[in-house]
Amino acid sequence: RKVLREETLNSMKAIWTKDKKDVGEDEYEEFYKHISHDWNAPLTHLHLKFEGTTEYDALLYIPSQAPFDLFNPDMKHGIHLYCKRIFIMENCRELVPEYFRFIRGVVDAPDLNLNISREILQQDRLVRNIRRNLVKKLFDLLNKMAADQYKTFWDEFGPGLKVGIHSDHENKERIAELARYTTTK
């Protein structure tokens, strides 16, 4: 006797394609836990929909705790790259600078070439534009964070962000504005 039953193996939806107002906080948290394999809620998230010369959707998360291997040079970046909701690669280093390697999330670029290697990806104009826009939006998000939330962020990720002052000459002023140092006052 055979019994057939249906079981959903992958229940996650592509919530990054939805409008922000159609996604609840619980959906954001559940999706974060799915893609990051972290059981803690994220500190905050950034849901973007870019249109114009560079078109893409992005859903990025700042974890509430730094991963244990944050300073390991072999640490995987946490951004998954998609093209028209088709998975291209995980741990896409080209989308954010090294000092943002703790960021988790998804970027879906419909204009991306599907036959793309890592070497071609590094020189791709579309990927460079996406990277520039994501970095700008991440800095904006960090600048708008509430003081207590930013303190949590800085305590967890500050030392990693300080590396960017030396490695990213284009954004060193923005990183320096975010830097916090302990004083005796």
Labelled PLM ranges:
Residues 1-185:
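Conserved GHKL (Bergerat-fold) ATPase module
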